[in-house]
Amino acid sequence: MGSQLALKSRIASTASLEKIFNAQEMIASSHIAKARDVALNAKPYTDAIFDAVQALVAHTHIDHPIVKKDEDNPRVAVLALTSDRGMAGPYTSSIIRETESLLARLDAAGKQPELYVYGRRGVTYYKYRNRDVAGTWEGDTDQPGVGVAESISKALMDAYMKPADQGGVSELYIVFTEFVNMVVQKVRVLRMLPVELVLPEQQGSGPVSESDADAATPLYAFEPNVDEVLDAILPKYIQSRIHECLLTAAASETASRQNAMHTATDNARSLIDDLTRKLNASRQASITQELTEIIGSADALNKKEE
């Protein structure tokens, strides 16, 4: 009897969890279409800004922080985009794993990485381990707004534009999850600064030489001058890239949460079925034992009467 009570209790608690998982899956399902569309709609603007930066870099060949890497400055900024909430499968753990791998590679190369973290789960992870974090942001990782992108880009731009002797960094990296589709989300490492010129037909093959740069984009006239245009466009470039990464990361988080909750719901239902079979088997065994005892008692009484 005690075994049956324990099974009933487990079935009830698992059924309660199954309802929670199913509700979370439905909520994520209702958000994913909007999150995906927002991420896709932000891409054309980001691409246009990047094309403008490419044009500036390709046709000026000037000495500007946007393209010049300070080889004497070992400090590097790394931004990790995690989530505020859990129940999203391996979403945050995958980001942290890739971030740790990047930090290790930078350390091995003689760099001094400075970590920036967006998302409560990542902030808690590094705070619990007493790791130094240069900047943190929390809130609305599944629906990031322009405000948080502005805040992050300002902090990173301030760090990038500072002189080396004042604690400035020479490179900016961002670790995020790119939304591919509902099933596939890829963790990526993007170097935002300095900018590397890439020709359209050479996407993914790395930077190109200055001799090929003039073929990358059409000719432009820059007013009032190239330096002022670069100074004006650089903050917009960083903010737009970060905002796009935040949006695609939000879509990835929502998709990951939906997939995780769908799997959890299926597992809960499977466990309920398994526990129900065990409960039925226990009941059947209990009934069989009671019948056996009754029949045995009746036989004993009959023999006694004889």
Regions from the PLM with identified roles:
Residues 1-306:
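C-terminal beta-strand-loop-alpha-helix "lid" module of Rossmann-like NAD(P)-dependent dehydrogenases
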